[in-house]
Amino acid sequence: MDKRTFLKVGGLAGAGLLATPLVSSLLGCGSAPGPNTNGSETTASGFTLPELGFAYDALEPVVDEKTMRIHHGKHHAGYVRKLNNALKTHTPSGQSLEALLAALTPKDTGLRNNGGGHFNHALFWKVLTPATEQSQQVPAGTLAERIQASFGSQEALLQNLAAAAGSRFGSGWVWLVQDVNRPEKLFVASTPNQDNPLMTGIVDASIQGRPILGLDVWEHAYYLNYQNRRSDYVNAVLNRVNWSEVADLMA
């Protein structure tokens, strides 16, 4: 699915977000198997594990190599494998991961957990960087303007993200989300487990939208290096955000 593919599904078809590239295509998430011309088989094996875009040790000392190898090569790979297995009991449609997630209901446990796990991790890897270039470390252009308008400053945004991570009980994710009805508005949200703001049939309407930054606060993301010091991990990893990539994910 190319970067000019459009999405119109459920709550994601809000004003200003109709003619925008799919987030999942930008992340390299792939798409579900699609039907052959005879409708009896699939033309693809399903979703695939995206490359990191950097070496496993490239985020050290913020995230250690062992954690990265386990997190990407085992946890994320496991979500992809289980997602493809779960899709075997559903009619192949060739739809994007975004469309799949937006159509889920609370009864779709396997697709919810593993589809969410795949998308969430793909986004996480996309917005991390080992680089220290100023252009990547500081929001610029339209993103900077929207952060200023929505939060007052970049520092206030980072404080909001850290606070949301600290208040998330147990496992989950923290998000910077673009409002579906007011694209100029950004807000911070948090979801449990592998839920995300794309799941319009599951998450509360107040946190639905287009996720442009995701922060993993499951213990497997940090425990080897930080043990129970989640706040230390959060503050450190926020210094490895590639704001240029975040900007590219906006509608």
Give the location of each predicted region.
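An amphipathic alpha-helical core segment
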Residues: 163-166, 171-227, 235-241
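Short His/Asp/Glu-rich catalytic/ion-coordination signatures at enzyme active sites or charged loops
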Residues: 51-75
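All-alpha RGS (Regulator of G-protein Signaling) helical domain and cognate RGS-like helical scaffolds
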Residues: 42-46, 74, 80, 84-94, ...
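Low-complexity, Gly/Ser/Thr/Pro-rich intrinsically disordered linker/tail segments
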Residues: 244-249
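Acidic/His metal-coordination segments adjacent to aromatic residues that form catalytic metal sites
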Residues: 58-62, 101-106, 202-203
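C-terminal segment of N-terminal export signals and the immediately downstream linker at the start
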Residues: 22-59
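N-terminal export signals
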Residues: 5-27
